[in-house]
């Protein structure tokens, strides 16, 4: 994608903006764990538990579940060396791999690590859990963990042209999906139709318009609940 493309986003600049904010707040390494942080900096969707280690300078490194690492690397602008997969077994789990990565960025073993801690009404927000926080704190004894999610929140508030254009195109595609469903349900078409069929009609119409992925907000439950998933 070139700079002249209407959907172009300068992701390396976003990383540098985060690094400039890190420097201003005396943060040596930033550990992103929220879905919004990963999407905003990677240009890839990470449905599995994932993390992004951002050094004070240079490229960040993403860590995701090994079965999805190749796909994330393919979707993201980062090269394969900066998208790694973890396995939930000793020495290869996310705590071990990420701690090793952070230690390499802090040669003297000391520094300030920005983390994302908080609460949300959104289940897969991605804030560090208490277990993760405690494990990172134990694995990095010379490192001070500080809450820093406001860095990304502040920077992401201002939308660039590529982001605005992506929102507009996504909205247009959704309108097509709604129209297809409305037409299918009109004049008694809803009779005998299940919620999953309705969801499929919307997905099919949107895919034909260029959609590459659809994910219902609660993971599928709102189009697969109760008796409506079968013929009524």
Across the structure, where does each feature detected by a protein language model lie?
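A composition/biophysics-driven feature that prefers long, compositionally simple stretches
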Residues: 1-177
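Short catalytic-site patches enriched in acidic/histidine residues
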Residues: 38-50, 149-153, 158, 189-232
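Active-site pocket-lining segments that scaffold enzyme catalytic pockets across diverse folds
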Residues: 171-183, 194-203
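Contiguous, non-catalytic segments that form substrate-binding/exosite surfaces or channel walls
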Residues: 186
